[in-house]
């Protein structure tokens, strides 16, 4: 019933009434587009997510119960009536669909009998009414209308009334069918026909849009007594004008009706066709009045005004006529002749006698054609008229009209059409030319150029006139059928009619074409016959599937050769399967044709729209080569048509244009995700377009451009033009140059770009999410508000944002390309003339660039393409070679751009370091061109904010993905992953901006920024995190973010909304801003910005924060790559990460690196001094910490960059933990200030971290953003914590990044000096060697030690920390101890915080170790990390309580780990370092500990893992924290190897990798879950995992909750951890947290907060001891008891008993996506943890399989990845990424498979979507996670399972866990 499923999508129309998407009329409008997409290809079913309907997140059709029993369809009948009224009322909107629907119906009807199946219906009739559905059980065919099925909601699985007894309205059915039979025989009534249409619709299911249209139309016809005349026709007409594009979608549905209509025009020789044609002829809504499209009305009014009201002589007549319209009885009667209806005079008519008014839907010809009638199908009932003062209009009477529609064209007409104006509306009347005797057929002259028709034109003279030019030409035309598109354009009115019919009937006609057209093809085919080819083309378009399915005829070409009779027979004989196959084939053909059309349209559009588009196309061609070009053309082709039409077209075109179904699916997914965003689509679209143009996101560009074209045409042409002007210079030129160079230097990247773009563009969701997540995009509410189908186009980097900051417009979307280009230019010449000193190295970080050339690798990854010097390129090449550097070049650009953007907000902070500032000015100038993002940031705060978003967007955005894939699968992965957080960092960016401000005003600003930002950031973060998953939330957040983004600076200024201006100010505040921009960009790209940011500690941190998040996001993407790379090329990958990320950072970061070194001393001292409370210094420290984290990907890079490339890595590896400690310290000490903990950390731990910090500007930014989010959480929940939270946030973000980077770098770092640096930082010299040391945990341990040491140092600042550090050290080894310590520490809140930090740092170290999973020690490290995670959670728990107000809150956020990460930003620093810098920052914010894991995992899976990482990190953290076996859980997550054992046994190193990955995945899942869970209270998170997630998430949320109620959450946190551990099941409580919308907005924080809040009581109930118990015994479900407090959670813990089983079961469930496993949440926790581990492992392994995995990872891991991705996607990708930021989610998508595996995840992406509406998110996550999340735990687990399913499920399940 796949066809039916699409129908279900089609049901979107009905859905329109009944479904979420359907519920919004606009949605319906958009829906057709989406539907169309769906129509495009069967896959759309999944991707389409029917109409950006929010409810069906990942599902193709909102109305479908995928996997569920089809819901009863009785409402179908009533909805039609509703639709009918809607048709009548809003003909424009739904009616179109309805019309199409009815048309489609006929088409289906054409197929009539689907084989020899038995027909049995409650109506008692056995005729095929054209809308029949087959029982999946007994194969009985029934009338859809009789069975009460909503044509728009055709169930996926249908059972007849006997197989599924239910109440049906038999009387209504009988009435309907009787009427239909009459209609079929008389052809007079169409009401039944409409109904019939619906059944046809069923088979038209694939035509998502058509179906929707059909449904609506069907309903109208069905319900309305007007059915006879299908008011739908009129509606269709109007809708055509109003929404030509949509109509295009609908048209396929309509086509069905149209085909029969056409049939009447042409001789349908087939008997079947004859009946159907009769039905078609009769099935139209009688039009008593005309419907006018806005375009026609506007034009007519314009002409009328010009002429004057009475100008038209016929106006009066018209008035008279109109007055008599209803009374006037036309002297004609319709007769059926040769299977077609003709109009004959009922009496002798004198010349110039009014015969009849031609009624229907009036629209402009271009609107009609825009609907997609490219393939010249005859549109028998469309009248073209151009005599009205040259106004080219047409009247579409196919579904809505009167008898005049039957008037045929003839070479010897006896009547003509004349227009009259009445009441200001134009009317067309048929007047006799000469006397017409009674019984003579009324004919009119051809209103179209039949000579250009590619089908056989039917002439009314028929063969009576042997000299008939039409007949002669007609015989030839059959041969030319194939050139449908050209014909469509060339044809005259009729041709247009045909073309229009084609598009509208592209879907409908497709069916019709096969049947009707084919039949019409008989030698006798008349002028209106559709040529088979045309039909085929149409079929290939939307209706293809349906047509094929319905008609099941081979494709039109074949049909062409057969007589209509034969065709009909073949159709009848074809089985449904055959028909389906045919439909699919046709769909493919359609796609190809669509591409062709698109290209043509592109040509038109390029000229019509803006040169920029052409440039864009060129750029695309250059950069993406043919693929992109094709896409661009396709999309552009759509653009030329009216905006509305364009959208549909674009949609269709996009779907079709994507030749690869996978791509299409992605696109659909993206569309679905973005669907919510479409409301403001115009602006966004334009922005998107511009961004695309700039970004050279080839695919995205085309899509965006297409969508934008529409929007631009409508609204944003000016902006577009503006942008284009710049773009041509910067983007086109630079990009072209860059691309060419890139191709030369990195041949792969270019290809990757080409391919990536498709991938990116393909997944509208991804695009939307990415774009939305992107810093630049964050602000754009349009993205969220605009329909998803629009989003797809706008998604890339909403150009609007760019427009807003026009100066920055270039940066955001173009930033990447520009940077890349500039990087190439720099390589060739100096990096942009403007980039004087830094330019050469990496325009991104001016000063840093000059200083750090090593970081070029990172730059390479991120900004290498732009500012990469030859060296960098070389490195990049190496990286590419070793690590799929394909994406490297592209990645750089995206990252760079986002990074810059992020940094821009922090620039002020960074400004502190003169370096950046100096170069900043230069950079700013140079960078401006180099990457718009930098400049845009400067241009205006909004721009900046936008820029941030945009920049972030680029990273996350398809483009970035594209690049990542193309150029640096790994780096990109990291970068992308990092960006994910960065994107998440939209909030982060806000945070960044705040941070920047903070940089200026380190203490207050920081806190405020953190605090303010948290709210904003949280939304942004959430948005970014949940952006993909939860578009709505994302929207809100995005909206919030824009304000917040801008408010960040304001936040600094304490003015949230002023933020924009302020932000801009912040950015612009100091030249640094630009430098920062570069830094940020670098950071985004890699951690370069971090380096630059490093210049100013605060700034750095700020940047770190941003970077952290953005980087996290990007990093996730990149990390996935990294993970893959690391496993295969640990060194290479590490180096890639190191070099690329580091280099990317290094360009900006290297100088900071040097500075870092000196900064190390400097900051060490400062830290010592800061311990007093210098936030700024702390921030840098944090920044360093983040940077270390940033080392991971972007942040990690930043960190690494800061150090040396090698050192960077080391720092990243080593420092990440310290950084967290630092962050934690800042947080801890700075409970209220965010400074103390940081200071403490800074002083001891951050000494090296200071270097780190310097290099971690991005991390800092990220951290800040994170902290801000946390602070927001804190503000919301615990203002006390709020202040610290931001700091922590920053640090954690960085830490997160670091871990990711670390994991990549760790191999190198472990061997490198960074560890020493870390050692310096840390008192322990072991940091580097900690790998062996359990406590230190390998090199990671180095970090761990650093962390520990840092904590001690922190301890120095804060005495408690000292003890805790020791504890942490011990704890690392003894998981229970740490937890117990944590518990013990609980009393010493501050110590706890410090300890937590230490622990987290240790964890980070562990994570880092884990990150260096390649090393057996790393396994140990991982285990250690896990322990750390657990310990950290313990400590965090402890810490949480004490620092409750500020530090605690953040720590709490992270509760065990999550708290550390999230609420525990301070503690999270280690975690962050540990975790994915990206996710942790956002998503993982809550999961500090988890982040470690996540980074580890992320490393390999990078994209997936990163997101997963974060989630998993969180999860891990949660796991660690939550289950007593948390360590195990974490481990599990980390390493199933040491699933249960607390000890960090390094099971098999590979497993660690896998485990790591898995852990990461779980983490990611968890994180996602955490976030989702957080949102959902993480109820769904596996008990263990969920528990963690739940409690953990709860912890995370608790952290937020802590923020809210630090005290509460403190206890809560422990309990939360416990909950996680024991009572992940507490899902119930978690859901309440979702209730907190604001928090939810904060998603990472918010979710945590919610969770925490929810679990607060329970959490409190759970004692640290119990929590510890949970942690300790967490693995064993026994711990559940300990968390009595969190009874809700607690009882899930019992499930934990079920625990492993439950988890496994749950996981399996997850795979099954059954949420039943909720009960086993605790085991889930453990299991989740373990599961995740396994999942991670499974996933991890694929990623591990090779650096290639990232891109490959996405694909190679697709099995695993899908597991993971699925996990992620479901849990991790969607939620996880969503938590981290949809960005990572996007990055996930970047890993095509990843995203794709997310299929379900797509739905989880919906989780992300569901995520967006945090409150709803919880529900949505549930929803998203669907059943999985429905049950808190099951949902989560399901997600995990879903994600893991391929690999994880099996690996994990089979092996991992147990």
From Swiss-Prot:
Gene Ontology CC: one annotated term: nucleoplasm
Coiled-coil region(s): 559-615
Biased composition (Polar residues): 505-520, 672-687, 1049-1068, 1186-1206, 1222-1235, 1400-1432, 1506-1542, 1581-1599, 1642-1651, 1698-1711, 1798-1808
Keyword Glycosyltransferase: no
PTM annotation (Phosphoserine): residues: 623, 837, 845, 1070, 1273, 1359
Single annotated GO MF: transcription coactivator activity
One Pfam family of this chain: PHD_5
Chain intervals with Basic residues compositional bias: 646-670
Main location: nucleus
Sites carrying sugar chains: 435, 440
Region annotation (Disordered) ranges: 217-269, 475-530, 630-687, 887-960, 1039-1068, 1164-1561, 1581-1835
Chain ranges of zinc fingers (PHD-type): 118-166
Low complexity: compositionally biased ranges: 887-901, 933-957, 1285-1303, 1349-1362
Subcellular location: Chromosome; Cytoplasm, Cytoskeleton, Microtubule organizing center, Centrosome; Nucleus speckle
Residues bound to Zn(2+) 2: 135, 138, 160, 163
Motif (HCFC1-binding motif (HBM)): 63-66
PTM: Ubiquitinated. Deubiquitinated by USP7. O-glycosylated at Ser-435 and Thr-440 in the SET domain by OGT which probably prevents KMT2E proteasomal-mediated degradation.
Biased composition (Basic and acidic residues): 232-250, 494-504, 1039-1048, 1273-1282
Function (record text): Associates with chromatin regions downstream of transcriptional start sites of active genes and thus regulates gene transcription. Chromatin interaction is mediated via the binding to tri-methylated histone H3 at 'Lys-4' (H3K4me3). Key regulator of hematopoiesis involved in terminal myeloid differentiation and in the regulation of hematopoietic stem cell (HSCs) self-renewal by a mechanism that involves DNA methylation.
Written domain comment of the UniProt record: The PHD-type domain binds specifically histone H3 tri-methylated at 'Lys-4' (H3K4me3), thus promoting binding to chromatin. The SET domain does not bind the methyl group donor S-adenosyl-L-methionine and histone 3 H3K4 peptide as a large loop prevents the docking of the 'Lys-4' side chain.
Record disease entry: O'Donnell-Luria-Rodan syndrome: A neurodevelopmental disorder characterized by global developmental delay, speech delay, intellectual disability and a subtle facial gestalt. Additional common features include autism, seizures, hypotonia and functional gastrointestinal abnormalities.
Family of this protein: Belongs to the class V-like SAM-binding methyltransferase superfamily. Histone-lysine methyltransferase family. TRX/MLL subfamily.
Subunit structure: Component of a complex composed of KMT2E (isoform 3), OGT and USP7; the complex stabilizes KMT2E, preventing KMT2E ubiquitination and proteasomal-mediated degradation. Isoform 3 interacts (via N-terminus) with OGT (via TRP repeats). Isoform 3 interacts with deubiquitinating enzyme USP7 (via MATH domain). Isoform 3 interacts (via HBM motif) with HCFC1 (via Kelch domain). Isoform 3 interacts with E2F1; the interaction is probably indirect and is mediated via HCFC1.
Protein name (record): Inactive histone-lysine N-methyltransferase 2E
């Amino acid at each position: 019933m796949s066809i039916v499923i699409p129908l279900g999508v089609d049901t979107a129309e009905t859905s329109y009434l009944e479904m979420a998407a359907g519920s919004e009329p606009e949605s319906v409008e958009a829906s057709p587009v989406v539907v169309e997409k769906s129509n495009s290809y069967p896959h759309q079913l999944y991707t389409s997510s029917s109409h950006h309907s929010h409810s069906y997140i990942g599902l193709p059709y909102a109305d479908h119960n995928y996997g569920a029993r089809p819901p009863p369809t009785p409402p179908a009948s009533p909805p039609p009536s509703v639709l009918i009224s809607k048709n009548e009322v809003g003909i424009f909107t739904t009616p179109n669909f309805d019309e199409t629907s009815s048309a489609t119906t006929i088409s289906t009807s054409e197929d009539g009998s689907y084989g020899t199946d038995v027909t049995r219906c409650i109506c008692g009739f056995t005729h095929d009414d054209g809308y029949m559905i087959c029982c999946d059980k007994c194969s009985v065919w029934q009338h859809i209308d009789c069975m009460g099925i909503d044509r728009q909601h055709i169930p996926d699985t249908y059972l007849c009334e006997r197989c599924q007894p239910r109440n049906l309205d038999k009387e209504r059915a009988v009435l309907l069918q009787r009427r239909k039979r009459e209609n079929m025989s008389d052809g007079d009534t169409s009401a039944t026909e409409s109904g019939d249409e619906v059944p046809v619709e069923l088979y038209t299911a694939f035509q998502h849009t058509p179906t929707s249209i059909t449904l609506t139309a069907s309903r109208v016809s069905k319900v309305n007594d007007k059915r006879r005349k299908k008011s739908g026709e009129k509606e269709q007409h109007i809708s055509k004008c109003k929404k030509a594009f949509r109509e295009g979608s609908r048209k396929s549905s309509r086509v069905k009706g149209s085909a029969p209509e056409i049939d009447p025009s042409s001789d349908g020789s087939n008997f079947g066709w004859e009946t159907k044609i009769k039905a078609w002829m009769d099935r139209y809504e009688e039009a008593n009045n005309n419907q006018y499209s806005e375009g026609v009305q506007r034009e007519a009014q314009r002409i009328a005004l010009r002429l004057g009201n009475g100008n038209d002589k016929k106006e009066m007549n018209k008035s008279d006529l109109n007055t008599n319209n209803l009374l006037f009885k036309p002297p004609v009667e319709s007769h059926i002749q040769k299977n077609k209806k003709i109009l004959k005079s009922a009496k002798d008519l004198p010349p110039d006698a009014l015969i009849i008014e031609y009624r229907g839907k009036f629209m402009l010809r271009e609107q009609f054609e825009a609907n997609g009638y490219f393939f010249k199908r005859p549109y028998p009932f469309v009248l073209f008229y151009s005599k009205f003062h040259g106004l080219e209009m047409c009247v579409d009477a196919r579904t809505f009209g009167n008898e005049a529609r039957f008037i045929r064209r003839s070479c010897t007409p006896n009547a003509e059409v004349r227009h009259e104006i009445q009441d200001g509306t134009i009317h067309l009347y048929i007047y006799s030319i000469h006397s017409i005797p009674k019984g003579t057929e009324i004919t009119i002259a051809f209103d179209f150029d039949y000579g250009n028709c590619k089908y056989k034109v039917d002439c009314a003279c028929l063969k009576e006139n042997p000299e008939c030019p039409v007949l002669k030409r007609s015989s030839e035309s059959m041969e030319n059928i194939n050139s449908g598109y050209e014909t469509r354009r060339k044809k005259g009115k009729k041709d247009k009619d045909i073309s229009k019919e084609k598009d509208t009937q592209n879907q409908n006609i497709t069916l019709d074409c096969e049947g009707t057209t084919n039949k019409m093809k008989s030698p006798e085919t008349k002028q209106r016959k559709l040529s088979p080819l045309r039909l085929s083309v149409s079929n290939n378009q939307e209706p293809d599937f349906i047509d094929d399915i319905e008609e099941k005829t081979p494709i039109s070409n074949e049909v062409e050769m057969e007589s209509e009779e034969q065709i009909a027979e073949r159709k009848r004989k074809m089985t449904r399967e055959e028909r389906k196959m045919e439909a699919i084939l046709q769909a493919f053909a359609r796609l190809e044709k669509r591409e062709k059309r698109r290209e043509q349209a592109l040509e038109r559009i390029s000229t019509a729209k803006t040169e920029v588009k052409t440039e864009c196309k060129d750029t695309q061609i250059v950069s993406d080569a043919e693929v992109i070009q094709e896409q661009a053309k396709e999309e552009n082709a759509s653009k030329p048509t009216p905006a509305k039409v364009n959208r549909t077209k674009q949609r269709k075109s996009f779907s079709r244009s994507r030749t690869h179904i996978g791509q299409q699916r992605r696109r659909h997914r993206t569309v679905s995700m973005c669907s919510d965003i479409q409301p403001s689509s115009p602006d966004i679209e334009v922005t998107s377009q511009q961004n695309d143009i700039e970004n050279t996101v080839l695919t995205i560009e085309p899509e965006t451009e297409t969508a934008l074209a529409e929007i631009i045409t409508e609204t944003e042409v000016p902006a577009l033009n503006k942008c284009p002007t710049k773009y041509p210079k910067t983007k086109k030129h630079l990009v072209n140059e860059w691309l060419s160079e890139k191709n030369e230097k990195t041949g792969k990247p270019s290809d990757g770009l080409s391919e990536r773009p498709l991938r990116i563009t393909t997944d509208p969701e991804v695009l939307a999410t990415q774009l939305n997540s992107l810093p630049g995009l964050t602000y754009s509410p349009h993205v969220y508000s605009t329909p998803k189908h629009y989003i797809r186009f706008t998604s890339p980097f909403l150009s609007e944002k760019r427009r807003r900051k026009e100066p920055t417009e270039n940066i955001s979307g173009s930033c990447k390309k520009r940077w890349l280009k500039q990087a190439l230019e720099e390589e060739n010449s100096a990096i942009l003339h403007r980039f004087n000193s830094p330019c050469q190295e990496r325009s991104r970080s001016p000063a840093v660039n000059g200083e750090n050339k090593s970081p070029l690798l990172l730059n390479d990854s991120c900004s290498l393409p732009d500012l990469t010097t030859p060296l960098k390129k070389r490195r990049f090449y190496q990286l590419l070679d070793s690590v799929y550097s394909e994406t490297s070049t592209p990645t750089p650009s995206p990252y760079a751009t986002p990074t810059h953007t992020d940094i821009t907000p922090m620039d002020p902070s960074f400004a502190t370091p003169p370096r950046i500032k100096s170069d900043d000015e230069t950079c700013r100038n140079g960078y401006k061109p180099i990457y718009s993002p930098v400049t845009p940031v400067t241009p205006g705060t909004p721009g900046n904010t936008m820029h941030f978003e945009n920049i972030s967007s680029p990273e996350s955005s398809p483009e970035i993905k594209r690049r990542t894939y193309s150029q640096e699968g790994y780096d990109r992965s990291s970068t992308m992953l990092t960006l994910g957080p960065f994107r998440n960092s939209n909030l982060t960016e806000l945070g960044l901006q705040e941070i920047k401000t903070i940089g200026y005003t380190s203490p207050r600003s920081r806190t405020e920024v953190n605090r303010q930002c948290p709210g904003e950031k949280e939304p942004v973060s959430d948005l970014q995190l949940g952006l993909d998953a939860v578009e709505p939330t994302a929207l809100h957040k995005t909206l919030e973010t824009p304000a917040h983004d801008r408010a960040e600076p304001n936040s600094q200024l304490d003015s949230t909304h002023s933020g924009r201006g302020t932000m801009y100010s912040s950015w612009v505040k100091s030249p640094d801003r630009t430098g920062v921009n570069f830094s940020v960009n670098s950071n985004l790209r890699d951690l370069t910005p971090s380096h630059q940011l490093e210049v100013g500690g605060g700034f750095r941190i700020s940047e770190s924060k941003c970077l952290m998040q953005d980087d996290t996001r990007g990093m996730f993407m990149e990390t996935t790559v990294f993970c893959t790379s690391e496993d295969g090329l640990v060194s290479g990958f590490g180096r890639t990460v190191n070099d690329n990320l580091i280099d990317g950072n290094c360009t900006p970061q290297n100088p900071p690196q040097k500075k870092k070194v000196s900064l190390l001393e400097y900051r060490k001292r400062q830290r010592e001094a800061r311990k007093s409370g210098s936030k700024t210094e702390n921030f840098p420290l944090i920044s360093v910490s983040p940077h270390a984290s940033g080392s991971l990907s972007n942040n990690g890079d930043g960190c690494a960059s800061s150090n040396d490339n090698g050192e960077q890595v080391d720092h990243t590896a080593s420092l990440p933990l310290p950084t967290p400690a630092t962050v934690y310290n800042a947080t801890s000490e700075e409970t209220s200030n965010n400074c103390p903990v940081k200071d403490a950390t800074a002083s001891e731990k951050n000494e090296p971290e200071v270097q780190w910090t310097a290099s971690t500007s991005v991390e800092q930014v990220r951290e800040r953003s994170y902290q801000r989010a946390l602070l927001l959480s804190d503000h919301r929940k615990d203002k006390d914590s709020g202040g610290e939270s931001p700091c922590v946030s920053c640090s954690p973000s960085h830490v997160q990044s670091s871990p990711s980077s670390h994991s990549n770098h760790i191999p190198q770092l472990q061997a490198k000096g960074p560890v020493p640096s870390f050692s310096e930082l840390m008192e322990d010299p072991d940091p580097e060697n900690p790998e062996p040391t359990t406590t230190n945990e390998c090199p990671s341990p180095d970090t761990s030690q650093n962390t520990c040491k840092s904590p001690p140092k922190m301890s120095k600042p804060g005495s408690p920390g000292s003890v805790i550090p020791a504890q942490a050290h011990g704890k690392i080894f003894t998981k229970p101890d740490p937890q117990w310590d944590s518990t013990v520490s609980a009393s010493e809140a501050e110590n706890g915080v410090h300890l937590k930090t230490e622990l987290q740092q240790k964890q980070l170290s562990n994570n880092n170790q884990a990150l260096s999973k390649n090393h057996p020690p790393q396994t140990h490290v991982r285990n250690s990390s896990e322990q750390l995670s657990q310990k950290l959670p313990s400590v965090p728990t402890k810490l949480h309580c004490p620092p409750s107000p500020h530090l605690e809150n953040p720590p709490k956020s992270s509760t065990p780990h999550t708290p550390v990460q999230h609420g525990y930003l301070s503690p999270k620093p280690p975690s962050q370092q540990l975790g994915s810098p990206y996710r942790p920052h956002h998503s993982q914010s809550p999961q500090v500990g988890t982040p470690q894991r996540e980074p580890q995992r992320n490393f390999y899976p990078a994209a997936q893992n990163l997101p997963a990482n974060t989630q998993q990190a969180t999860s891990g953290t949660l796991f660690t924290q939550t289950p007593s076996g948390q360590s195990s859980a974490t481990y599990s997550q980390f390493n199933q190897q040491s699933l249960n054992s607390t000890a960090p046994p390094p099971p098999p190193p590979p497993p660690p990798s896998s485990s790591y990955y898995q852990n990461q995945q779980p983490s990611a899942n968890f994180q996602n879950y955490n976030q989702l869970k957080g949102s959902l209270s993480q109820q769904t998170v596996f008990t263990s995992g969920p528990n963690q997630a739940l409690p953990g998430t709860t912890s995370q949320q608790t952290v937020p909750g802590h923020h809210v109620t630090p005290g509460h959450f403190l206890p809560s946190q422990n309990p939360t951890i416990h909950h996680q551990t024991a009572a992940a099941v507490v899902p119930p409580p978690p859901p309440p947290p979702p209730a907190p919308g604001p928090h939810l907005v904060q998603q990472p924080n918010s979710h945590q907060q919610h969770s925490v809040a929810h679990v607060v009581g329970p959490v409190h109930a759970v004692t640290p001891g119990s929590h510890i118990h949970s942690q300790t015994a967490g693995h064993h479900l026994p711990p559940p008891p300990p968390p009595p407090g969190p009874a809700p959670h607690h009882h899930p813990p019992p499930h934990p008993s079920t625990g492993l089983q439950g988890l496994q079961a749950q996981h399996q469930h997850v795979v099954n996506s059954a949420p039943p496993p909720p009960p086993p949440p605790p085991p889930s926790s453990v299991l989740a943890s373990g599961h995740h581990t396994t999942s991670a492992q499974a996933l991890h392994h694929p990623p591990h399989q090779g650096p290639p995995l990232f891109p490959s990872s996405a694909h190679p891991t697709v099995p695993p990845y899908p597991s993971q991705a699925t996990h992620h996607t479901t849990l991790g990708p969607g939620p996880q990424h969503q938590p981290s930021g949809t960005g990572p989610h996007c990055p996930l998508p970047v890993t095509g498979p990843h995203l794709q595996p997310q299929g379900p995840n797509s739905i989880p992406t919906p989780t992300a979507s569901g995520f967006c509406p945090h409150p709803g998110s919880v529900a949505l996550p549930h929803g998203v996670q669907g059943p999985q999340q429905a049950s808190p735990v099951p949902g989560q687990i399901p997600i995990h399972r879903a994600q893991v399913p391929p690999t994880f499920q099996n690996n994990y399940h089979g092996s991992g866990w147990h």
